[in-house]
Amino acid sequence: ILHIFTHDNINFNIMCNNRQSAASNLSNEQLQVFLTSQLGDGHIHTTNSHSTYYVTNCKYEEYINYKIQLLGDFFKNKRKLEKNGFCQTPIWEMRSKSSDILVDIRNMSIKDILNHLTDLGIALWFYDDGSLHKTDLYYNLNTHKFSEEIHRELFVPYFKDK
């Protein structure tokens, strides 16, 4: 099935695995949040009952609220975890509603994800996994989870063209 997303005169064509889905209902903003879950923070999770949803967290409630705004009617709930991780510090967590389209997005290749990223998606990716070096005034994008091949063949050419 070929899903076509249209928002602000931008078309997003995503080839999926022969399933019906809610894809035609995604806005560009929703799509960008879900795409960046495959690159940076956030995760698309499938439960034992085959319900698939997006979840992310951040210590800054304002950023979680921004992602909630972007998700619009795909937002399900938000909560504060008082003790998280090794340091046991508070963190905010947000979850989307379940949708089959999230399975298709999770299964997209990195190349296809990069081809569908807009400036908003790049900004979300940098906020999730970037770091500003204030002394030398440059950003680092932490992409350690990806192979050297993906860096060489996809990320380097992608950012050279930006």
Regions flagged by a language model, labelled:
Residues 1-162:
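Internal intein/HINT superfamily modules and their associated LAGLIDADG
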